[in-house]
Amino acid sequence: MRATLFTSVASVLWTGSLTFASPTAKSADLASFISKEGQRSIVGISENLGGKGSKTPGTAAGLFIASPNMANPDYYYTWTRDSALTIKCLIDLFEISGGGYSISTKELETGIRNYVSSQAVLQNVSNPSGTLQDGSGLGEPKFEIDLNPFSGSWGRPQRDGPALRATAMITYADWLISHGQKSEAADIMWPIIANDLAYVGQYWNNTGFDLWEEVDGSSFFTLAVQHRALVQGSSLAQKLGKSCPACKSQAPQILCFLQSFWNGKYITANINLDTSRSGIDLNSILGSIHTFDPEAACDDSTFQPCSARALANHKVYVDSFRSIYKINAGIREGSAANVGRYPEDVYQGGNPWYLATLAAAELLYDALYQWNKIGKLDVTATSLAFFEDFDASVKKGSYSAHSSTYKTLTSAIRAYADGFLTLVQEYTPSNGSLAEQYNRNTSVPLSANDLTWSYASFITAVQRRSSIVPASWGEKSANAVPTTCSASPVTGTYQAVASAFPTSTGCVPATDVVPITFYLIENTFYGENVYMTGNVSALGNWDTSNGFPLTANLYTETDNLWFASVELIAAGTPFEYKYYKVEPNGTVIWESGDNRVYVAPTGCPIQPNQHDVWRS
């Protein structure tokens, strides 16, 4: 997010009424800040989740809004990438019973399952990037909050979203398998995951817009997460007795292509495009931390956080911001500095991003974990300059965990990583709200407020600081680079997934509204629309001019499915309803028979579904 080729650049300050912590006097020690801000981040994510959050009016259950901001900039949409990274964070917390935060596993799993259901719908939504029929529509980066396509000009397609979504869902599917719920993993999760894996296998060698939605080329971040997704997808397919031919054949070729981004000094974030940029970019830091494998060695081929390439790249990236931000004045090399997307950035004035400064810390915590697990660290010609910032006399060589050099270096690097968190602490308002950016001169938060991705980034960074890491994704068996690169993508097959996740967690108190999804089978023609109305205000009180519209986003020639998600009916309310069609000339055609009757349920599940067939 979110300067695109189609949007003008403006400097817009966020005008919230906030109190700021002094950059020169910490309001609390780092440990206390981490504890409080971690809980604040959980709240921030929850508030931005549709079907639950207080800041998501009109948002479908399971969708994350990027931010509650509706203007300057307008981020009141759902992005596939941001959402996938956020739900992966929550799935990791779910697997460790909430990670010590004040959120229950029941609440986490409800959110996870609602997310899965929402993505099953979004995969089927035709959009400016294409349709599900040939998979092209899966590359659409953002959607309206009501599950409809965003039709405005944008940097599309973006090819990281399907890979990130697949990785998140595979993680949850693996949990289901390990907890005796293999049938749910196979019947509900796999069809959604398979679509995304097919997309990666088919389109990985096509150019697309980068994660900042600005340049059209080949992106390091995109290719890195695509490689991981196919490796994990192959493993899941084997567990479920499914087939993913593209997973095994294409993952090595993606890894082969990924080596093209290393220029000998740092990772060039984007290639195969005409640009004057240096290629130094947060893109590469995020690529390493989102393909971090706690069981991996310090492999250069996969750019693991402890690898010589990742460390050299980290130094080049951080150092590129030292002289361009006023708030970095006087900060020497080897000390944490505020960082942004890339040094040439001009969006909203080109400022530090909270998630960037947090990512700089997270990569170092990942590296520390890997060194401690391996029991040594290696200083090579490639990584020497990085290590010299912490010990000017260090020489190339291998240092065991028992050596004084190892202890000196790792202690200094941990302090360096903590320094990035301290900067976030210094520039976070006293209410804990994390915006997208903070001003390069004044440190005032700006751009979109309460950015979901910022909150998720805080949680993952501090989890890694505590050596709480996700499960291995199989890097050890997938780090061998083929001797010859061969681009031979596999044309995918795609399947519409119509059913919502039958959640067994999450309950609805009798005083709350309950989201209900109505599914209707009816054969219609182009221009004919379907509505429902009833004796409650949410359905228009029998007024056909104010009925509730159904959408045909899941409609196919073989499955004439219309659906509507109604969210404003109080739990326990009995009501009548009926479907009708509106012809192109405005004529209303009612279905036959008596009024249908339904009682909005209390208890579980939290998102009930009603399946109907048009009565002729």
Predicted regions and their residues:
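CBM-like carbohydrate-recognition segments
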Residues: 51-64, 68, 125-129, 133-139, ...
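Low-complexity, Ser/Thr/Pro/Gly-enriched N-terminal "stalk/linker" regions
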Residues: 20-81, 114, 118-143, 327
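Structural helix-adjacent loops and short alpha-helical linkers that scaffold large soluble proteins
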Residues: 22-35, 93-113, 172-194, 234-255, ...
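Aromatic-rich carbohydrate-binding modules that target alpha-glucans
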Residues: 523-574, 582-602
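Fungal secretory targeting signals
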Residues: 1-24
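Acidic/His metal-coordination segments adjacent to aromatic residues that form catalytic metal sites
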Residues: 64-72, 139-156, 201-218, 262-273, ...
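Extended ligand-binding clefts on enzyme/binding-domain cores
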Residues: 80, 120-156, 160, 220-227, ...
